[in-house]
Amino acid sequence: DVELIKTKIGYMSQKFSLHDDLTISENLNFYGGIYGLSSKQIKNKMNQLLNQLELENEKNNLVKSLPLGWKQKLSFSISIFHDPKIVFLDEPTGGVDPITRREFWELIYAAATRGTTVFVTTHYMDEAEYCDRVCIMVDGKIEALNTPGQLRQTFNASSMDQVFYTLARNAKRSELT
């Protein structure tokens, strides 16, 4: 049942799904409605989220006026607005400064602590260090799957960058014909 699945899964695309021509609160109302939340649930969740993100004074501003980091944090918060069991994040921290990246990961940790399973795709190997388990793909194939610590140990590496470099360097590239 598609409607049941929608209640269990969240998704944040690399290109934001926020509507730039709507205000922050209008976006929250819109997505809350899509997720099937009642008006009361939307209002309660909106107040909680605006407080958490420190956006109470910005709620009537158009999304297009927000800095990139705020848009990313808002987009993530909307993807878990309905308390899904699983959320998929596609390159969630691309293009933001290191402080905003760290703040974003704090939001991810908070969601995981509340029981949401979080899948993250990233090209930042330092972010892989923040994960409980890491799957490294090279040329579209899974080359490694384990905890960051176990992967570093297996590949005798001091960082996830070194693990990835070793895997990518040793990959058998298919030739173009």
Predicted regions and their residues:
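ABC ATPase "signature
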Residues: 145-146
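Helical segment within the ABC ATPase nucleotide-binding domain
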Residues: 102-114
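Conserved ABC ATPase signature
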Residues: 62-69
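Catalytic Walker B motif of ABC-type/P-loop ATPase nucleotide-binding domains
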Residues: 87-91
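Conserved ABC ATPase "signature" region
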Residues: 29, 33, 40-58
